Curated annotation (Swiss-Prot):
Comment field (misc): The cv. Suxie No.1 (SX1) is more tolerant to salt stress than the cv. Tianlong No.1 (TL1).
Induction, per UniProt: Induced by salt (NaCl), osmotic stress (mannitol) and abscisic acid (ABA).
Tissue-specific expression: Mainly expressed in stems, leaves and cotyledons, and, to a lower extent, in roots.
PPIase cyclophilin-type domain span: 7-170
Keywords, in A-Z order: Cell membrane, Chaperone, Isomerase, Membrane, Nucleus, Rotamase, Stress response
Subcellular location, record wording: Cell membrane; Nucleus
Function according to Swiss-Prot or TrEMBL: PPIases accelerate the folding of proteins. It catalyzes the cis-trans isomerization of proline imidic peptide bonds in oligopeptides. Promotes salt tolerance, probably by maintaining the Na(+)/K(+) ratio and good photosynthetic state. May also be involved in the regulation of abscisic acid (ABA) and Ca(2+) signaling pathways.
SUPFAM superfamilies linked to this entry: Cyclophilin-like (SSF50891)
Keyword Nucleus: yes
Effects seen without this gene: Decreased salt tolerance.
Protein name, UniProt field: Peptidyl-prolyl cis-trans isomerase 2
Any one GO MF annotation of this record: peptidyl-prolyl cis-trans isomerase activity
Length: 172
């Protein structure tokens, strides 16, 4: 089976910014890819927090130019929340794939075995994250949109304008 492809339709400051299409490495990280895929479709319904297990309407709360764009906290919206389809947190599946350059999709965490729903898209090679964060996909279309998101970021991670996943889902 080919790897699934999912999308984010993004807005920046309330204006449509375009679509990011990501291939998920279900062949290498099946559990991590499935978590992200299901959070894109929203098919699992509400989570333990009572909020839908869905990226739709969530924001990229932390954007650092020449590093990464982080999102996926659909419970608190500020980097303190998020929830996986497996319950609150799940284990690091493996570290087979590396942070090789722009467009790499990886799980944000707060230490070993603390994966939830937060993720980041690299805007450069981040090899120091290898073995600490699970790489589970890559951007295949829309790196121009990622670059636009990067432009509203700052060294502190705070965004100058809201960056929102207006819609999301699965393409294949």
């Amino acid at each position: 089976m080919p790897n699934p492809k999912v999308f984010f339709d993004m807005t920046i400051g309330g204006q449509p910014a375009g679509r990011i299409v990501m291939e998920l490495y279900a062949d290498v990280t099946p559990s991590t890819a499935e978590n992200f895929r299901a959070l894109c479709t929203g098919e699992k319904g509400a989570g333990r927090s009572g909020k839908p297990l869905h990226y739709k309407g969530s924001s990229f709360h932390r954007v650092i130019p020449n590093f990464m764009c982080q999102g996926g906290d659909f419970t608190a919206g500020n980097g303190t929340g998020g929830e996986s389809i497996y319950g609150a947190k799940f284990a690091d599946e493996n570290f087979v794939k590396k942070h090789t350059g722009p467009g790499i999709l990886s799980m944000a965490n707060a230490g070993p075995g603390t994966n939830g729903s937060q993720f980041f898209i690299c805007t450069t090679k981040t090899e120091w994250l290898d073995g600490k964060h699970v790489v589970f996909g890559q951007v295949v279309e829309g790196m121009d949109v990622v670059k636009e998101i990067e432009k509203v970021g700052s060294s502190s991670g705070r965004t100058a304008k809201p960056v929102v996943v207006a819609d999301c889902g699965q393409l294949s």
